[in-house]
Amino acid sequence: MKLVFAGGGTGGHLYPALAIAQSWKESHPNDEILFVGTPRGIENTVVPKYGFPLYLLPVEGIPRKVSWETLKKLFLVPKSLINAFIFLKKEKPDIVVGTGGYASFPVVFAATVLKIPTVIHEQNAYPGIANKILAARVDAVCLTFGEAKKRMKAKNLYETGLPVRREFFTNAANRNELRKKMGVGKDELLLVAFGGSQGALTINKVVGYLLPEIMLRPNLRLVWATGPRNYENLKQKYKNLPERVQMVPYIDNMPEVLPAADLAITRAGAATLAEIAASKVPAVLIPYPYAAENHQEHNARAFVSHGAAVLLRDAECSEDRVKATILPLLDSPEKLVKMAENAGKVLRRDSLKEITGIMEALLKPKSNKKT
């Protein structure tokens, strides 16, 4: 069998695809897996590390507000569709799986026209425009949140939860060994701050407010992912940081970092929250305020209601509010332990099994024809 995974641009779309692909490869080692992405997406550096071939499509995100930039990028859509048809006709995959992102739409759409079995996964409670269009055409729609059913017109909707790479679960179960490997002492706290694959200005501002306090606490370690665009400026601004404060552009080995943390400060994208839950890490969640339908705040509230996180709105991140929210958590290890336990209960742990089962069911008719 040959499988094509289309998804990327950001980690939120790419990592669920990688989780499914890894799981499939474990149970079907002889099957061929290809990824389709975009020239500027995070997949260019991440996918090769997992050993999967990557095909690039010339397509970019289209801004929701009408402008000359919107029209310019719309001209790329027909080209990307043509390239998607050419690619699929050449590779002849048995199934196409889309997890959102710029490359997902043209590849999945072309696959539906070519009558190739198709599955899409929608990460958020408020589906994106591309997946709303595709939902009526594909063979199966997998959803993280059941309430997304109200916003999608499709025959075969499945509430599967969000797939997470197995390393998160494995490393969470071996947390003490992971902390030793990172050099985190028994009496030390590890704070991890990140804002997605591109970073987040607000997260960086929040960490800046906390740095003087971190300097005064020798038992507090920090891994701070600034985002590639902000790294050089912040590196110049905060010179001579102690060794226990590690500033990096991006955490590309997140399964080896996040499960070791005592507290995370991050946005509230669905994929990030699934990884936090799999890692059993409490969090301070600062939802991206411009997400469609404010879906990140909705995601965050699910964690808050389970006692696994604290919510800070972007507009509320003044220095006083940040310190009043986060410092008491760092002073309450017992509370962090309880929040960590609650975080581990939020996530469905059978997502990969259910999604791969749906894929296998779609492929059965093809298997029968070949035998």
UniProtKB/Swiss-Prot annotation:
Q: Which InterPro entries match?
A: GlcNAc_MurG, Glyco_trans_28_C, GlycoTrans_28_N
Reported EC number(s) for this entry are: 2.4.1.227
What are the binding positions for UDP-N-acetyl-alpha-D-glucosamine in this chain? T10, G11, G12, N124, R165, S197, I251, Q296
EC class: transferase
What GO cellular component term, any one, is given? plasma membrane
Q: GO terms for molecular function, please?
A: UDP-N-acetyl-D-glucosamine:N-acetylmuramoyl-L-alanyl-D-glutamyl-meso-2,6-diaminopimelyl-D-alanyl-D-alanine-diphosphoundecaprenol 4-beta-N-acetylglucosaminlytransferase activity; undecaprenyldiphospho-muramoylpentapeptide beta-N-acetylglucosaminyltransferase activity
Write the record's keywords in alphabetical order, separated by commas.
Cell cycle, Cell division, Cell membrane, Cell shape, Cell wall biogenesis/degradation, Glycosyltransferase, Membrane, Peptidoglycan synthesis, Transferase
Source superkingdom:
Bacteria
Q: How does it sit in the membrane?
A: Peripheral membrane protein
Q: Which reaction does it catalyse?
A: di-trans,octa-cis-undecaprenyl diphospho-N-acetyl-alpha-D-muramoyl-L-alanyl-D-glutamyl-meso-2,6-diaminopimeloyl-D-alanyl-D-alanine + UDP-N-acetyl-alpha-D-glucosamine = di-trans,octa-cis-undecaprenyl diphospho-[N-acetyl-alpha-D-glucosaminyl-(1->4)]-N-acetyl-alpha-D-muramoyl-L-alanyl-D-glutamyl-meso-2,6-diaminopimeloyl-D-alanyl-D-alanine + UDP + H(+)
List localization entries: Cell membrane
GO BP terms, alphabetized = carbohydrate metabolic process; cell division; cell wall organization; lipid glycosylation; peptidoglycan biosynthetic process; regulation of cell shape
**What pathway or pathways are given for this protein in its record?**
Cell wall biogenesis; peptidoglycan biosynthesis
Cited Pfam families: Glyco_tran_28_C, Glyco_transf_28
Q: Which HAMAP family match?
A: MurG
Function, as annotated, reads: Cell wall formation. Catalyzes the transfer of a GlcNAc subunit on undecaprenyl-pyrophosphoryl-MurNAc-pentapeptide (lipid intermediate I) to form undecaprenyl-pyrophosphoryl-MurNAc-(pentapeptide)GlcNAc (lipid intermediate II).
Family assignment?
A: Belongs to the glycosyltransferase 28 family. MurG subfamily.
Mind telling me what this protein is named?
UDP-N-acetylglucosamine--N-acetylmuramyl-(pentapeptide) pyrophosphoryl-undecaprenol N-acetylglucosamine transferase
